[in-house]
Amino acid sequence: MNLLYKSTRNSDKTVTASQAILKGLADDGGLFVPVSVPKLDVTMDELKDMSYQETAYAVMKQFFTDFTEEELKHCINSAYDSKFDTEVIAPLVKVGDTYHLELFHGATIAFKDMALSILPHLMITSARKNQVKNDIVILTATSGDTGKAALAGFADVPGTKIIVFYPKGGVSHVQELQMVTQKGENTSVVAIHGNFDNAQSGVKAIFEDKELAAELDAKGYQFSSANSINIGRLVPQVVYYVYAYAKLLENEEIQAGEEINVTVPTGNFGNILAAYYAKQMGVPIAKLICASNDNKVLFDFFQTGVYDRNREFILTSSPSMDILISSNLERLIYTIAGQDAQKDVELMTQLKEKGVYEITAEMKEGLKDFVGGFATEEEVKETIHDTYQKTGYVMDTHTAVAAHVCAQYRKDTKDEKKCLVASTASPYKFVRNVMTAIDPKYDEMEDFALIDELEKVSGFPIPNAIKEIRRSEEHTSELQSHEPIS
């Protein structure tokens, strides 16, 4: 059966998976969602014996039904190969009484690699399937990790160009170096004097500019996105939650059918939405625990049903979560509104014009699978420090947010279900914050000296991505947030 996609802001018009991947954002500004989330057509017993690549095919074939088996397997095998520093792609590590799903073993040492390694292949295949002759210009706003992963994925891919916008001073030093040292004739990096929300809003405005689109089309170009608003980013993220459950089963950490909780450090809401889709596909997930940092707009939303971005934007040690407008939440809003596009438009208009909206009591019922929590900067430091002291395991700042929220949830609710924590970035990406949390004395050392020190204390070898930035040249541009980014 051919699974079609529709916009969250117009339920009448449908497109194929490949068309949704190519467009990125719907013409009406909405996000593409499947008409219905498909069920897995293989059992967990079968999945537990599968490799990551085989699991990816089992999941993606249910969503990307207009791809042939040969096309999809080619995309998967081209993505999940030696670019990852472990054959299992996404290892599960038991840390104390939780299970960390390490999603940072790809080329840019962050979870974005899990989807951005395959997106260029999905996009080029989609272009071929739809007889697209234009070059595809990828526009991406980043709060840190997406930028480098997208640049690495699309670098020198024929028929594409990529422009990444990031907030100057709003990403870690390592994240910035990774982006501005990216090689590739078709890559551009622009720093804006503003925050991530400014960058993301600017990119969305470009997508919605019909005159600009027509002008570019006449010159042989068309826009698409590598942000998680693109369904081609979201679906590959579903895979690792299915894979993780199957591996827990294979390792006899859980019984068949046993429910687990999943905690995800959350900013733009894509990663936790992927876990929600995995649950809808049939993975026995009980609670989806949404972990926020001091920018706790999502925590407040789950507590009250009110989404309010009218608040101070706080720069934290987990910059990929420093977001006040969580774009992917719109997909969940559309779902809990009973796929009512008119209601979605009403709420998104309120968000754009007033910065706030409130969902109905009936919609709030649809959030019962979700729990919100947040960690302060001090709690992040304590979690990194205490986990290292007790177990020897070193985690990055974003993962520490999730680990703290997971532990707090267990303490508050006495829920004894096993908990999976999405470990979203290598500690090497946030080396100063991580090392000074372990011991404040490290603050006196320079970043590259800290990298060597982290290797000693963690036992994690220095990743190639970090070795590369030591010997690369920088290239970047800067924009004020009020300047047009077109």
Question: PLM ranges: what are they?
Answer:
Residues 1-28, 312-314, 323, 332, ...:
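Charged, compositionally biased N-terminal leader segments and the immediate start
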Residues 30-109, 184-219:
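Small-residue-rich anion-binding loops in enzyme active sites
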Residues 99-156:
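Well-ordered mid-protein domain cores that form the structural environment of catalytic cofactors
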Residues 108-110, 142-148, 231, 264-271, ...:
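Gly/Ser/Thr-rich loops at beta-strand to alpha-helix junctions
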Residues 149-186, 190-200, 253-256, 261-348, ...:
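Glycine-rich phosphate/pyrophosphate-binding loop at beta-loop-alpha junctions
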Residues 209, 217-252, 258-259, 335-413:
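Active-site-adjacent helical/loop segments in soluble small-molecule enzymes
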Residues 283-302, 403-470:
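Catalytic phosphate/nucleotide-handling subdomain of diverse soluble enzymes
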Residues 474-485:
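Single conserved hydrophobic/aromatic residue that forms the stacking wall/gate
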